[in-house]
């Protein structure tokens, strides 16, 4: 059976300590679209609960977290460990597939796109860049899996 024929819904997540960008795609078209940001909560458990509510609302079958792998393998960031912990919490709370996807430079790419293509200044780029980065992460994942 072709995996693309099953009903699927994907949530792409670009995690930040203040804001979390979100993107969504569902079958049959699987076109990733930015759906906004969620403010990070005071704890990872509260943040996970906020994300789980979106996951349930949209009947998400797979969550794709952007995982900021370091350019040099020796350096891991605190954000990376928070992402891993948050992903594990969501996995526990939902029992759906949670994937950590290499997102190196997706935020920088989103910033460049908003600056050059949209002509937005730094303040105007602040909020949309997170959800655009999540869209780029989800698009990269879907392209690699050829789920369209």
Curated annotation (Swiss-Prot):
Its main location: cytoplasm. Keywords: Cytoplasm, Hydrolase, Nuclease, Ribosome biogenesis. Disulfide bonds: none annotated. The keyword Acyltransferase does not apply. It comes from the Bacteria. GO terms for biological process: rRNA 5'-end processing. InterPro entries: RNaseH-like_sf (IPR012337), YqgF (IPR005227), YqgF/RNaseH-like_dom (IPR006641), YqgF/RNaseH-like_dom_sf (IPR037027). It holds the Pfam family RuvX. Belongs to the YqgF nuclease family. Could be a nuclease involved in processing of the 5'-end of pre-16S rRNA. HAMAP family: Nuclease_YqgF (MF_00651). This is Putative pre-16S rRNA nuclease.
